[in-house]
Amino acid sequence: MAEDLDELLDEVESKFCTPDLLRRGMVEQPKGCGGGTHSSDRNQAKAKETLRSTETFKKEDDLDSLINEILEEPNLDKKPSKLKSKSSGNTSVRASIEGLGKSCSPVYLGGSSIPCGIGTNISWRACDHLRCIACDFLVVSYDDYMWDKSCDYLFFRNNMPEFHKLKAKLIKKKGTRAYACQCSWRTIEEVTDLQTDHQLRWVCGKH
């Protein structure tokens, strides 16, 4: 009788308490094989815990991604800086000032054989950007012409700067250059420093 009971227990144990079935948690363990605890319940609890952990990590990843996106977004309120360095700014200002033009120093008058341009101590060029500070007129010049001796202040006052009117007092002469504003006039043949003629109020208007 005892032997039959042992064989029955062995058969039950072999059927219901195999290691594969226990690992898979698919059957209920008899009390003799583990104290009556359900392996499937433990597996379900473990699966839920794993799922919660996965969801937590996913939320944390989403939060990190959101923070990174916020940090990477450009600040719309912040205007882009267009200021250059101090040195480059000074260079730009200096270039702008230089771009306004250069003045002759000294200022020369000259006949038609003297090239026009910016006069310097080593470059004798006749200034062709003259302005009179007395009448505030630009000084005109005509190559290979000279003024007639009958010219007077009223003639230039009434006819400047119309060439077709002024030519009534212009005489052809090769090598000379006729200068005039509304209040003064000169016929020049050689290079002449403007400072030597104290009656003229002409200055270089910059090139």
Swiss-Prot record:
Lineage summary: Eukaryota, Metazoa, Chordata, Craniata, Vertebrata
Keywords: Bardet-Biedl syndrome, Ciliopathy, Cone-rod dystrophy, Cytoplasm, Disease variant, Obesity, Retinitis pigmentosa
Biological processes annotated in GO: photoreceptor cell morphogenesis
Compartmental location: Cytoplasm; Photoreceptor inner segment
This protein's GO CC annotations: ciliary base; cytoplasm; cytosol; photoreceptor inner segment
Gene that produces this protein: CFAP418
Assembly behavior: Interacts (via N-terminus) with FAM161A (via central region); the interaction is direct.
Tissue: Widely expressed, with highest levels in heart and brain. Also expressed in the retina (at protein level).
Protein's name according to its UniProt entry: Cilia- and flagella-associated protein 418
